[in-house]
């Protein structure tokens, strides 16, 4: 390994506590998709401190941003994520389920590390470009809303990936490997059911249960699974079951 590459790697080692502190801070303040305001501010501040030119509010998304360094080709994009999941609050350093806030947000698959690791990689490439004097551009893309928000799709639609020679990312896992592959596309659909409320004991025949309709649709979807190809997935959440009183027809 030549001295320039050693210097680039030394940048990561020298600033390890800095990158780790970002990961820890995002773990401690888990924010849901497209609401990662503290995380976005943390990253844009870090990018500016590291000498990147920062752009905020990409594609009109408040928590999407980029930090670039260098000029010319190759142009290397490095993608970072940082959103959390609802209901997965977890104490750090504990190997058993132990929430900080019961029912609160948490990082179920390491997005606190994902963004910080990508930032470290971008900093290493920046150091290599600066030390070698070679042409090239590195761009760190802050990609919010990975857990269902699909911000990358909007960023692609707006042409943010045009001009890149390569785009790289990583994901925390139990193995250390380099891999390529594809992922399923994702479509989100929100269904709303409306019924007619009625007293379930005294006037049930005049009620129209929206909850019954939800359950019938869900059962139909379960039967549909048998006839779908192996690469398809269906997931669901009932966000409003209509009410909490069993003696009322849920509307």
Each PLM stretch: what is its role?
Residues 63, 85-87, 93-106, 112-113, ...:
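Histidine/acidic-residue-rich, glycine-tolerant segments that coordinate divalent metal ions
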Residues 2-107, 112, 116-136:
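Acidic/His- and Gly-rich active-site-bordering loop/insert found
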């Amino acid at each position: 390994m030549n001295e320039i590459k050693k210097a680039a790697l030394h940048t990561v080692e020298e600033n390890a506590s800095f990158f780790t502190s970002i990961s820890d801070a995002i773990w401690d303040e888990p924010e849901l998709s497209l609401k990662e305001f503290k995380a976005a501010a943390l990253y844009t501040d870090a990018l500016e401190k590291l000498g990147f030119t920062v752009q905020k509010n990409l594609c009109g998304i408040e928590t999407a941003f980029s930090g670039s360094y260098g000029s010319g080709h190759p142009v290397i994009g490095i993608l970072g994520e940082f959103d959390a999941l609802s209901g997965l609050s977890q104490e750090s350093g504990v190997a058993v389920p132990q929430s900080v806030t019961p029912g609160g947000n948490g990082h179920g698959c390491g997005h606190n590390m994902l963004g910080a690791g990508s930032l470290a990689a971008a900093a290493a490439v920046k150091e290599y470009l600066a030390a070698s004097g070679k042409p090239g551009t590195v761009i760190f893309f802050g990609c919010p809303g990975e857990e269902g928000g699909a911000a990358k799709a909007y960023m692609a639609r707006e042409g943010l990936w045009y001009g890149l020679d390569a785009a790289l990312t990583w994901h925390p896992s139990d193995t250390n490997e380099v891999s390529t592959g594809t992922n399923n596309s994702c479509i989100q659909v929100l269904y709303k059911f409306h019924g007619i409320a009625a007293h379930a004991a005294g006037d049930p025949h005049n009620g129209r249960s929206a909850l019954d309709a939800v359950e019938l649709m869900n059962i139909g979807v379960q039967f549909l699974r048998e006839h779908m190809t192996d690469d398809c997935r269906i997931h669901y959440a009932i966000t409003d079951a209509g009410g909490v009183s069993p003696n009322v027809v849920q509307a």
